[in-house]
Structure formats: structure tokens, C-alpha cells
Amino acid sequence: MAAVDPSVSGVSGRYATALFELAREDKSIDAVKADLDKFDAMLAESPELVRLVRSPVFSADTQSKALAAVLSKAGIGGTTANFLKVLAANRRLFAVADVIRAFRALVAKFKGEATAEVTVAEKLNDKNLDALKAALKSVTGKDITLNVKVDPSIIGGLVVKLGSRMVDTSLRTKLNSIKHAMKEAG
């Protein structure tokens, strides 16, 4: 059994740990992660799928049958499909986003990687993403996986969260600091 990661706890952590152990035994960690990433992307694109996953109105049987059809059409099979069907049968499908996040954390720890949450005002090009990864790798000594979120409200710059550290170089924060300083001065 893997050592428990403090960032992986609760119901979602237990399910993620069980899936991780199963994938490790089968030597299918990368395949399971790819399938979970695909399912996560499907959730991001489909409000109907989100409703199926989160709504308590659907019975476990209805969720399982609908999920089986969705997974089949998406080409998600094997360990991942069976695991998601178990979540549905156990009425835990609502926690799938947290399970995916916890599974990613376990995979990153297993591979000696670190994950950085990056918020930007506009989508970064590949050159800038590579430069950011290299800069973060030089600080941590680990390979970096970036989870990039676009949030126009930060106006410019970026916000990087890596473990317990956060660096906020957003224009919004700088403008708020200036505004606060002007209020104190005047």
C-alpha cells in the first residue's frame, strides 16, 4: 500500500488510492491517467454529463447504464471504465472530479513530479509554457506538470501555486496594492 499523501484524503482519496494501487499492479498507471484525463475533459465540455454525474435524482442503475454508454463511445475501457462503474454503483460518482485530482497527485508523487496550478489572463503559447516549466523545475528539482487556467480578471501576469507556495504577479494584484497604498497616503 502506498504511503498516504496528505493532499489525498477523504472518500475521494480512498477511491483514488485504490485505483492507483490497482493501476500500479497492472502496470497501467499512464493508461488509467490518460483515460481519466479524457473523462475529465468530457466533464468540462458537457453539462449533461456533469448533471448525470452529480445529480442524486438518477438511480445507481441509470447512472451505471448511461455511464457505460458514454465510456464505450469515448473509447474508455479496462481498469478505468470498471472503476468509474464501481463509483456509479456505490453512489460516489459525484466525487469523480476530486478522485481524478487525487489520482493525479498520487501519480505525480510516484513519478517524482510536482504539479503547478497556473492562472493566466490569456492562453500561453508553447514557448512560454516550456520556459515556465523550466523555471519551476530549476526551483524544485522536479519535473513539472502545469494545470493552466485562463482567468481574464487577473488582467495580465500570472499566478503560480506550487505545493504550499504561491507567487502572484498578476496586474490585478499590483493595481490593488497601488490602490491600497494611495488610500493610506491620502
From Swiss-Prot:
Record's bilayer topology term: Peripheral membrane protein
Keyword Transport on entry: yes
Localization, UniProt: Cell inner membrane
InterPro entries linked to this entry: ATP_synth_OSCP/delta_N_sf, ATPase_OSCP/d_CS, ATPase_OSCP/dsu
Record keywords: ATP synthesis, Cell inner membrane, Cell membrane, CF(1), Hydrogen ion transport, Ion transport, Membrane, Transport
Any GO MF annotation of the entry: proton-transporting ATP synthase activity, rotational mechanism
Pfam families noted in UniProt: OSCP
Keyword Cytoplasm: no
Listed HAMAP family: ATP_synth_delta_bact
SUBUNIT field: F-type ATPases have 2 components, F(1) - the catalytic core - and F(0) - the membrane proton channel. F(1) has five subunits: alpha(3), beta(3), gamma(1), delta(1), epsilon(1). F(0) has three main subunits: a(1), b(2) and c(10-14). The alpha and beta chains form an alternating ring which encloses part of the gamma chain. F(1) is attached to F(0) by a central stalk formed by the gamma and epsilon chains, while a peripheral stalk is formed by the delta and b chains.
Function comment: F(1)F(0) ATP synthase produces ATP from ADP in the presence of a proton or sodium gradient. F-type ATPases consist of two structural domains, F(1) containing the extramembraneous catalytic core and F(0) containing the membrane proton channel, linked together by a central stalk and a peripheral stalk. During catalysis, ATP synthesis in the catalytic domain of F(1) is coupled via a rotary mechanism of the central stalk subunits to proton translocation.
Family recorded in the similarity comment: Belongs to the ATPase delta chain family.
Protein's UniProt name: ATP synthase subunit delta
Phylogenetic classification of the source organism: Bacteria, Pseudomonadati, Pseudomonadota, Alphaproteobacteria, Hyphomicrobiales
GN (gene name): atpH
